């Protein structure tokens, strides 16, 4: 945002900067959350006229037949004018994907709007890094109209910190404070298991970043609830609750290789 603010402060008032961005990275790295923050910041510094955030997925643009797709795309873009349009899984609009003629029409309209509405529309297109590179390469007009922002996978320490923040927000406690020390090594084992077992599409991931933490937490809570309902102990997390939760997610990764 510092670059954007500098551009606004030093630019000739007749020059319109383009703030369209590619958010590239794996799921769970906070792309949609950061996009909302960017929209608010752009409004606050006067880069867009409204504090407005509109979302759309690639399949919402394509409709019926080729001519209808263009009309539908214009409706989506018109509704987003004044603010930020966030397109998730934008790589599905690549002309290299299955619906070449439809996607070509979508991109043609999108590029024209980005050019003609520099002062009242910012497009943030998000998706996997490799696929987003293919998306940009599918149309010569895309590359020069987007800034590339890479979202890295969370480290094991960051996953642990997110878990602890989640636990604190829900008011859950450990049966023994020392149990906090086993969270990091368990996440490390889980991440390494995921990295060594590609998903059904052959993609190697750490398991979903923020989504991985939510899954682990839910499994631990489920193990705790089952134990508590059975009359065994209180609601604080036990070592067995924690290990059971992580083991469930580790087994999911192992099953992908079968």
Where are these regions (language model features)?
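A short helix-turn-beta junction within AAA+ P-loop NTPase domains corresponding to the substrate/partner-engaging
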Residues: 136-153
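Walker A/P-loop
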Residues: 13-51, 75-79
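Pre-Walker A adenine-sensing motif
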Residues: 2-14
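C-terminal engagement/docking regions of AAA+ P-loop ATPases
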Residues: 223-258
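Conserved AAA+ ATPase small/helical "lid" subdomain
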Residues: 150, 155, 163-236
